């Protein structure tokens, strides 16, 4: 049985156990469902999903969306950033979203491994940011490990793209629609495809190819 339940050690112990699990996720260590406190983690994830579901149900004003996002992230969403529901998110506290961002509808963020979104980032509809992977060993496949995603300033991610664990997308890069991003993307480049491959550099208006 889960130690949080069987010992009845209360909220302080629960927070300590959950902190340990989250730190393991963020540091890339393996996390097993058999670990003490794992049930507490699942409860917290479901609490986040509950808030996200409330936000996603029916029309919400921009002010209401900001209120819900503040609860999900555990910190205020920048006033200059726009999020269009529905947004599907499992855990928001390890997620940071910068200023002037625009996040379109039907995106999915798996945040346990950590997501950092810079300023003025455009994220198209149905984009998936996935920071968690499973142990490839079939005997231990229920165990997971996290790898952070970092999206630098002024990135544009096209519709229906997926960014996989551990990827950094450099300043000003463009991810073509429908791409699967499996490795780091250099600044000021366009990538596209599955897996995403280099297409071209982005030149400023006064520059020539």
Which residues fall in each region the model found?
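Alpha-helix termination/capping residues and helix-transition junctions
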Residues: 6, 74-75, 182
């Amino acid at each position: 049985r889960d130690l949080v339940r069987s010992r009845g050690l209360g909220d302080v112990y629960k927070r300590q156990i959950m902190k340990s699990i989250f730190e393991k996720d963020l540091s890339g260590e393996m996390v097993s469902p058999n670990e003490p406190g794992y049930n507490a983690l699942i409860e917290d994830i479901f609490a986040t999903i509950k808030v996200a579901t409330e936000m996603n149900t029916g029309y919400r004003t921009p002010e209401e969306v900001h209120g819900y996002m503040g609860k999900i992230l555990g910190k205020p969403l920048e006033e200059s950033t726009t999020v269009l529901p529905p947004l599907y998110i499992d855990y928001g506290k390890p997620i940071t979203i910068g200023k002037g961002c625009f996040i379109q509808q039907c995106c999915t963020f798996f945040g346990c491994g950590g997501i950092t979104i810079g300023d003025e980032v455009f994220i198209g509809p149905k984009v998936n940011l996935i920071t968690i992977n499973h142990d490839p060993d079939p005997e231990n496949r229920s165990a997971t490990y996290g790898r952070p995603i970092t999206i630098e300033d002024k990135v544009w991610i096209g519709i229906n793209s997926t960014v996989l664990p551990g990827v950094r997308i450099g300043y000003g890069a463009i991810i073509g629609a429908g791409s699967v991003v499996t490795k780091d993307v250099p600044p000021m480049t366009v990538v596209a495809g599955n897996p995403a491959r280099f297409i071209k550099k982005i030149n400023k208006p006064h520059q020539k190819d």
